[in-house]
Amino acid sequence: MEALKAEEFLAGLISCREAFWEKMNAERKSYGAEKPLTPAIVLRRLQFGVVMERKAAEVTARWVGDIPDLDLQQPMSEYVVNELKHTSILRKRIGELNGDPDALWNQPLRELKELWDYHASLGSLCELIASVQFGHEEFFPRTSKSFIERVQSIDPQTASVYRDTLLADEAGHEWIAPEILRRYATDAETQKKCLEALKIGCELFGKAIQSFNQSLPA
C-alpha cells in the first residue's frame, strides 16, 4: 500500500471525523445533551471542561520535545500552555460558583478515563494529533456555541469565559494539527495508524459525552 498524498490523506481523516460528528450530533438530544440548563448542570459542564483541557495539555506535552521543526514546536508548546490556562480559568469560575474545581478530575467517569488513557497510550505524535487535535477537539467549538447560547441568560459570566477566551484561543491554533499531519504523516503505515487513532478516539469521545450527559443532575 502506497502512502496517500497529504491532501488526500487529510480529506480521508476529515470524512471519517465528520461522519462520526453527524452520528453523534443526531444522538445527542436522545441522551439529554440539549436539556435546559440549571446552575448545577452549568457547574458540571465547567468541571468536565477542566478534565478535557488539562488532559489535552498533559498528553500533548510529552511529544512537544520530539517535534523536529521549530515553526511547529513553538506553537504546539503554546497550545499546551493555553490548555493549562483554560484549566485555570475554568477552575476559577467553578470556585466563584462555590463548586469543587477538581470533582470530575478526582473522580472521573469511567468512559472519560478510558478516552484519555487511550490518548496517553498512543505511540506517536501523529497518532495523537489525528485523534485529539484533528479529531474530537474539532467538535468543541460546535458544542460550545450551543452551550453559550443556552447559558447566556442564566450565567453570562460563564458564557463570556467560553466565548471570549476558550473559543477565541481555539481559533488561533486550528492550523497546527493539519500542518503536523501534512509534514510528518508521510508513509502508509503512519497514515493507517492515524486513521485508526482518529476512529477510536472519536468513538471513545462519543461514549464519554453520552456518559457525561446521562450523569447530569435532573
Positions of PLM-derived features:
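Non-heme di-metal
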Residues: 1-218
